Every structure is written in C-alpha cells, then in structure tokens.
C-alpha cells in the first residue's frame, strides 16, 4: 500500500490495474478520482475560509462547470431571504457559487461566495454563512471535492492521500 503516508504519490494507473485484477470478469474500468477536504464551518455566522488542494485543478475550457462540488448544507438566499435546503458549492470560471439542484435544474442561490484558482488549487470562501450542514462527519463539517487536472496526484505540505472504504 502506497497511500496513507507522507511523500508518496497516488498513481492512477496502479489503482485501475488493481481494480482490473480483482476479478477475471473485469475487463476494463472507468474510475473517477476526486480530492476532498473537510471544512469545519461556523454555522449561521459569516466567516472567511481557505483550503489548498496543492494540485492543478481541471479546467478544460471557459464555461466548464464541475471542478468543485460539496456535501449539502442549508443557506439563506439573500435575494429572497428564503432559507434553501440541499445547497452545494459549485464553480464557474474560478468563482465559487452556492447552488441548488431541483427537478434537473440548477438554481444559483449566491453567485459569488469565493474563488477557486485552477493553477494552484487554492480555494477561498468569503463571508460564507451556511445555516446547517447535512451531517457527513459531524454537524459543522462540509466536504469539498475537486477534480484534478492530471490523474496522478502528488500530496504536498502535510497532505496524506487516503482511499476510504465508503468511497469504493
């Protein structure tokens, strides 16, 4: 096992080879790898947050959406003052938004709560104010997921790569 230790790189090809070799019936696989961080937030209070994924993030063209996503939380729509359940974070050309999907449509609840630097992997949230969070780890933690630009991932500065059993 090459994960769970400092200074070791995640090799996508090794993972897919392991998957292919688990059973002769598996001829090929399409595996998606996401980086994630757990962000502990202050509920119902506006705070600034910063996370650094320390890897280049996927941004193949202007207008691409889907590099960043998150677990769900409750957020107040400042335009309507309505509390929205089931909100998530998303990105649009380096701007982080609060969005909500319903009936296949994505509604933007807040069009700018921070930035995402695709080159450095740095994410900042400004005056971010979730009311409650959908408990994944605990009642004040949001999981943030990003797609990397390359499939091999290098942990930098106190990062450890772990594959959790619940994600397999």
Where are these regions (language model features)?
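Acidic, low-complexity glycine/serine/threonine-rich segments
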Residues: 1-48
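Acidic-enriched, low-complexity/disordered segments with a strong bias for Aspartate over Glutamate
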Residues: 7, 20-23, 85, 91-93, ...
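Generic serine detector
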Residues: 13, 54, 69-71, 90, ...
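Short, ordered beta-strand-loop transition motifs
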Residues: 41-43, 90-91, 115-120
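Structural flexibility/helix-modulation signal
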Residues: 67-107
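Surface-exposed interaction regions enriched in Ser/Thr/Asp/Glu
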Residues: 102-168
